[in-house]
Amino acid sequence: ESYDLVIANHVLFYCDNLEKVCKEVRRVLKPGGRFLCSTYGNSHMKEISQLVSRFDERIVLSANKLYEKFGRENGAQVLEPWFSRVEWISYEDSLLVSDPEPLISYILSCHGNQNRYLLDHYKEFRSFVKKKTEKGLHITKDAGIFICNY
């Protein structure tokens, strides 16, 4: 089977072998088909990491910097050998967080070591985040999509 369009939304940085992924996408795309793959860059939501580091510098929200595997900064290099045209389109966006609870829930759900340091100090951390979000905490979104033509 072949397809006009293949979409990979924020998943390529989880793949062990990006060359194999690109080869398979090329195999299933019809001539003239497109591969759309979204990702983010190294500034994506950086304020959240800065926030937790200010509370406890030992906290790392993710042991892996996924954008280093496939992100805005290096995605074109990964894709260009496989596609005739690769274009990056930024998704202009940001967050203004004024309610600490969803932010705390997000932080606790990350794949890093935060629970080791935050769960025993949850009340302190909640107060810290509440104070930081009182006037709204701006969070940078550094995401977008690569459009690849076959």
Where are these regions (language model features)?
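Short, polar/flexible loop-turn hinges at active-site or ligand-entry regions and domain interfaces
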Residues: 57-63, 114-115
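Conserved Class I S-adenosyl-L-methionine
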Residues: 66-150
